[in-house]
Amino acid sequence: QLFQPPFR
């Protein structure tokens, strides 16, 4: 998990 987009 290098990039974690903002999950709402």
Swiss-Prot record:
Tissues of expression: Nacreous layer of shell.
Q: What is the protein named?
A: Uncharacterized protein SMPP10
- What organism, scientifically named, is this protein from? Nautilus macromphalus
